[in-house]
Amino acid sequence: MQRHSTLASTAVLLSSLLCAAVAHGQMDDKYQPNAESKKYPEGSSIERRTRMAAIAANPAYTRKFDLSGLPDYKPEGHPTGILRICGNNYIGDSPLGGWWKDAFEKLQPGITIQYDLQTAATAIPCLAFDKADIGITHEPSFYDYLSYQRLKGHTPTGITILTGSYDVVGWQNNMVIVVNKANPLTKISMTQLDGIFGSQRAGGWIATTWHPEFARGPERDIRTWGQLGVTGPLADKPIDTYGYSLRYATALEFSDKVLHSTDKWNENFLGFGNYTKPDGKTYLEADQIVDHVRDDPNGIGYVRYHPKFPTDIKILDVAETDAGPFVHYSMDTLQDHSYPLWGGQSFWIDIVPGRPVDPKIREFTRFVLSRQGQELLQKDGKYLPLDAATVQEGLKTLR
């Protein structure tokens, strides 16, 4: 009887500790299902739109970046017809999509923009099956690329049109690397992240092309803190890795940026997904990652930054190479793309080798990349505007 009593007491204690940790790491309640959103099927486009309506309607930042280095939009032709755009629901849920449409149609009255912005998951399929002229999404998955190539004979072309948000959940809030507050480490390189989160591999991918030159052996694995230069009691301790379930786009983005788009992860990696707790609240994957790193002195995780991000874990500065420079996560370093883990959204279009880009697509993309287009994005106040170098890179793709 004493044993059962002890076990019961232990269970209650553990449950209390877990609840405290969950509450401490919980994101703002405005991201939780509400009375109105619960009227619709969980996870549906309309449920998500209803749940995020208040966030979508208002700017999250009011600062103004210097966009004087971006080109003014000047029409280079006046094509006519309907321009069909599919994908990213957050552009349609916020005022941004409407602002872009209204401003562009005044400058190009012969073009009518027709949106179908329900989810980024449909962007590449719509493009592949000729249901759209532009798909708006992040980097496609391997099977998005593959299905497109099977149908079209080539892969879609992406042109970056915006930078993900600093901390607005849904608007591609960007990734940070976190460790336990007691960890003395302050910085990490992309090469070291590969060693920590990855494992031996035979190669890697760019779209649907396999690259054996991305191979690496087990000697580049980093499995203890001492391998990162940490001294003291932590030096010989194993590194415990945390992040998103490998079925999430965030895990694919991290793999694309750090692991050469492979599926070879550290054998101790724990990935998390959203689930509904008994109280009806969603325990978000980001909160689970943060809670595990907070409670594990040996832990490191990648996680999307969000409002009310806890102060009792440490965010590491990140560099492209071991030599640096190591860059702090901030709105400025995201916007100028000096932070190595920055992410964005792209217009994905069909460019047939040897043929010009559809003039309707070309003109609208030029408008979005222009100072006028990026000023509207900045006015919306969630996504961050592009820097001049990224804009010029996109314009070159259209030529």
State what each model feature region is.
Residues 21-25:
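Boundary at the C-terminal end of the N-terminal hydrophobic targeting segment
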Residues 26-399:
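Flexible loop/hinge segments at secondary-structure junctions
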Residues 10-20:
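Bacterial N-terminal signal peptides
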Residues 2-11:
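Bacterial N-terminal signal peptides that target proteins for export
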